[in-house]
Swiss-Prot record:
Keywords: GTPase activation. GO terms for molecular function: GTPase activator activity. SMART domains: RhoGAP. This is Protein FAM13B. The gene is FAM13B. It holds the Pfam family RhoGAP. GO terms for biological process: regulation of small GTPase mediated signal transduction; signal transduction. PROSITE patterns: RHOGAP. Residues 661-671 have a biased composition (Basic and acidic residues). Residues 637-649 have a biased composition (Polar residues).
Length: 915
């Protein structure tokens, strides 16, 4: 078994002498091994894991290594010592060391600028093939060192996932290494971003050979030498094509151009970049070293953009730069009027070029040849003195006149797109003066200034264009929007992507001041030069719909429509409840559990919704409380969103004015409380007569009581809705008969539902329906108590006879007699308690003193028992431990109940006397 240390370890001591952790990747490469773009420590650790990892172990990549071992290994690598991972480390520590190296990089393997594009791409894509192409292109934008390291890591993890798929899937490995590659913190707030990163990383692992190893589709290279070779080849081809073009473009009057003119893909972009870099490198102000990285970046992007556009129309990073490119005015020479184009089929109409990368995705009009921006290098060199004072550029528009190729039925020709620009001036191409804008696509009158010259390439003759009269191009309404008839439209439609209709939007004239502001077309939003307008907002594409299509409404009837724009609190409550419900459903789908209050509080947006919902509910409750005087104000129906705001506004206002007068009249005619009470009593009496209910409550059955209770409840609610709940003493006195009757009915209904207990001394009392205690009146219980005493004596004799007969059957006469005596004593105690209510004050005081003395005696006995139990067992006595003194506890409870009864009776008889 060979050691995991690399054979080149002894030769890399000079590399390891410097610090490894926390050092950028480009510095590590420049430090000692420029040929090997993967850091040595990564290769060393990965080789060790592949040989001695035991990757079939469950949870190997999720187990953290020993912190002390990882720190010791880091110090060894930083100090330049030779490390033998087989003898000095274990697999979890090696994996933790690898992840620690990735985490300590100053810039992640996926830089922040590219990280944003990847996140946006992952959220916006709809097609898997398109997502794969764009992701592959974005990966090629990585620096060479980062690309090599990412490729090496993905190859290692893809091998692990393929050989141990049951244990380590691509998703699980992506969840472990994704945050390390992208530098994503695993906090709760970044859970969504972490999921996106894990999904991207899993896609890289599952489709590793498609993204990294497929040489047929890997058109661009990260090597500067290969880029230079490609640029040189393209520049040589361009020179040959240019010579042929100059020969065929010599001006001859009355001569028609040949139909066999070669169609050449123009890559003058790269040629001008090389020329501009060579010119700039000779300057004394800027050193060639500072230019090299920028030129390299532009070269890379240029090659990739041209190849991607030619092969599969993929949007590149130059798209962002071209969107900021503002076109200057179209210029022509004074010789333009002297040269005329022959042939009726030639159509010389100028249009500003659309984005070169998104040409296949936008609508192109075949009737207008595509113009291209020419930032001529020779013109730049001539005007360099003026550029130091004024930050301007000379822009030439390279125009190709369209001529008949012999086929008059084909109204459109295939055209080439030219884009020549200076790389050093790319960031300065911003239009400073709006007076130079010449809008030729909006079908308006336009003047072409003749004082400026057209920039040419080399010493070739400039093809002058005659002055175009565009005044009568769209005067008639019979003109229709032209649509492409060439192959590129068909190819785009066959690519599987959704295409806009060629007649998607009717072009409109420039709006007048008094007209309503229309919506800009999508094509005019990209480069800001020509403003196109659409008639119908329903025909806008997705990006144009982002603009608000608003129209200034006239206040047809009155200015009170603004008040109706506000949503009612009920609508806002429903909207917030819907948002919160959607959050809860999403949370439950993700975590299989309903969100708790802490989960809601952790999300500031949802917490804000909850706070607003609470405020709105409180507002609605306050509004209901304000309207509780008796008038139920009808809620205004919310206005339909589909109807115009002025629809029916005058009618609504007239209705409101008419409704105000009846409200005032109703308030003036509101009946008094006494009249309302009389009306309620009259209605109750009529209902009792209709349902044949007795007037006396005592004669009512249980069903009658239920009906009476419901009627009283409705009556009381009606009274409270008219006058509110009675609060003051006068208000309660007025409605007191109604409330007393309701309480009595409720009490009798409750008593009627209780089943009486047979054999109990208080059976008669429980079965009887108690009269309500009326405030300020003395309640008389003497007759009931006497009846209970007589019943108690009879009951005791009956119980005695029954017990005697039962004891005779059991042949235990003595025990039966003792039981009878005990029962009689208990009954006597109950009788004394009942008779104490009719006793005088001295008798009550005497019973009170005796009860207190007996209570004191029992409490002393129980306390002694509890203390002895505590000393014996070391704990307090529980309920099951009180069996020896159970009778004392029962007596103690009875004495306490008797004391409470005596104190109440004494306080009722004479509350002024102190006990």
């Amino acid at each position: 078994m060979r050691k995991s240390s690399s054979p080149s370890l002894s030769n890399c001591n000079s590399v390891l002498a410097n610090k490894i952790f926390g050092i950028p990747l480009d510095e590590l490469q420049q430090g000692g091994h420029p040929d090997n773009e993967v850091p040595f420590i990564v290769r060393h650790v990965v080789d060790y894991i592949e040989e001695h990892g035991g990757l079939e172990q469950q949870g190997l990549f999720q187990v953290n290594g020993n912190a002390e071992t990882v720190e010791w290994l880091r110090q060894r690598y930083d100090s330049g010592e030779e490390v033998d991972l087989v003898k000095e480390a274990d697999v979890p520590s090696a994996i933790s060391l690898l992840r620690f190296f990735l985490q300590e990089l100053p810039e992640p393997v996926i830089p922040g600028s590219l990280h944003i594009h990847l996140m946006q791409l992952s959220q916006d894509y709809n097609n898997e093939d398109e997502f794969g192409r764009k992701l592959r292109f974005l990966l090629q934008q990585l620096p060479p060192v980062n690309y090599s390291l990412l490729k090496f890591l993905c190859r290692f993890l893809a091998n692990v996932a393929s050989h141990h798929e049951e244990i380590w899937s691509a998703n699980s490995l992506a969840a472990v290494f994704g945050p390390d590659v992208f530098h994503i913190y695993t906090d709760v707030e970044d859970m969504k971003e972490q999921e996106i990163v894990s999904r991207i990383m899993a896609g890289l692992l599952e489709n590793y050979y498609e993204f990294f190893e497929n040489e047929e589709e890997d058109f661009s290279s990260n090597d500067l030498s290969s880029i230079t070779e490609q640029v040189n080849e393209l520049s040589e081809e361009e020179e040959e094509d240019e010579k042929l073009e100059h020969i065929e473009e010599l001006p001859e009057e009355g001569a028609e151009k040949s139909n066999d003119m070669p169609e050449v893909v123009q890559l003058r972009m790269t040629e001008n970049i090389l020329e501009s870099n060579s010119v700039t490198a000779t300057s004394t102000h800027i050193s060639p070293i500072s230019i090299l990285p920028a030129s390299t970046d532009i070269l890379e992007r240029t090659i990739r953009a041209a190849v991607e556009q030619h092969l599969f129309d993929l949007q590149s990073s130059i798209d962002h730069d071209l969107k900021n490119l503002q076109q200057q005015s179209v210029v022509c020479n004074n010789e333009a009027e002297s040269i005329h184009c022959d042939g009726e089929g030639s159509n010389n109409q100028i249009d500003i070029a659309d984005d070169i990368i998104n040409a296949s995705e936008s609508n192109r009009d075949c009737s207008k040849p595509v113009a291209s921006t020419n930032l001529d290098n020779e013109a730049m060199q001539q005007d360099c003195v003026f550029e130091n004072e004024e930050n301007t550029q000379s822009v030439g528009i390279l125009l190709e006149p369209c001529s008949d190729r012999g086929d008059s039925e084909d109204g459109c020709l295939e055209r080439e797109e030219y884009l020549l620009f200076d790389s050093d001036k790319l960031s300065h191409l911003i239009l400073d003066s709006s007076s130079k804008i010449c809008d030729l696509n909006a079908n308006t009158e336009s003047e072409v200034p003749g004082g400026q010259s057209v920039g040419v390439q080399g010493e070739a003759a400039c093809v002058s264009i005659p002055h175009l009269d565009l005044k009568n191009v769209s005067d008639g309404d019979k003109w229709e929007e032209p649509f492409p008839a060439f192959k590129s439209w068909q190819e785009d439609s066959e690519s599987g992507e959704a295409q806009l209709s060629p007649q998607a939007g009717r072009m409109n004239h420039h709006p007048l001041e008094e007209d309503c502001p229309p919506v800009l077309s999508h094509r005019s939003l990209d480069f800001g030069q020509s403003q196109r307008f659409l008639h119908d907002p329903e025909k806008l594409d997705s990006s144009s719909k982002a603009l608000s299509f608003t129209r200034i409404r006239r206040s047809s009837f009155s200015s009170k429509d603004e008040k109706r724009e506000d949503r009612t609190p009920y609508q806002l409550v429903k909207k917030l409840q819907k948002k919160i419900r959607q959050f809860e459903e999403q949370f439950e789908r993700e975590r299989n559990s309903k969100p708790s209050y802490s989960d809601i509080a952790a999300n500031p947006k949802v917490l804000k919704w909850m706070t607003e919902l609470t405020k709105l509910r409180k507002q609605i409750k306050d509004a209901k409380h304000k309207n509780s005087d008796g008038e139920f104000v009808p809620q205004t129906r919310p206005r339909s969103n589909t109807l115009p705001k002025s629809f029916g506004s005058s009618l609504d206002h007239e209705d409101e004015e008419n409704e105000d007068e009846p409200k005032v009249i109703q308030k003036e005619k509101k009946p008094s409380k006494e009249a309302t009470l009389e009306l309620i009593l009259k209605r109750l009496k009529e209902k009792r007569i209709e349902r044949c209910l007795p007037e006396d409550i005592k004669k009512m059955t249980k069903d009658h009581l239920v009906e009476e209770k419901a009627s009283l409840q409705k009556s009381l609610l009606y009274y409270e809705s008219q006058h509110g709940r009675p609060v003051t003493k006068e208000e309660r006195h007025i409605v007191k008969p109604l409330y007393d009757r309701y309480r009595l009915v409720k009490q009798m209904l409750t008593r009627a539902s209780i089943t009486p207990v047979l054999g109990s001394p208080s059976t008669k009392r429980r079965g009887q329906m108690l009269q309500p205690i009326i405030e300020g009146e003395t309640a008389h219980f003497f007759e009931e108590i006497k009846e209970e005493e007589e019943d108690g004596v009879n009951l005791s004799s009956e119980l005695g006879d029954m017990l005697k007969t039962a004891v005779q059957v059991q042949s235990s006469l003595e025990n039966s007699e003792s039981d009878v005596e005990e029962n009689q004593e208990k009954l006597a105690l109950d009788l004394r308690l009942s008779s104490s209510r009719a006793a005088s004050m001295p008798e009550l005081l005497e019973q009170l003193w005796k009860a207190r003395a007996e209570k004191k005696k029992l409490r002393k006995t129980l306390r002694e028992f509890e203390e002895a139990f505590y000393q014996q067992n070391g704990r307090n006595a529980q309920k099951e431990d009180r069996v020896p003194v159970l009778e004392e506890y029962r007596e103690y409870k009875k004495i306490k109940a008797k004391l409470r009864l005596l104190e109440v009776l004494i306080s009722k008889q004479d509350s002024s006397k102190s006990i």
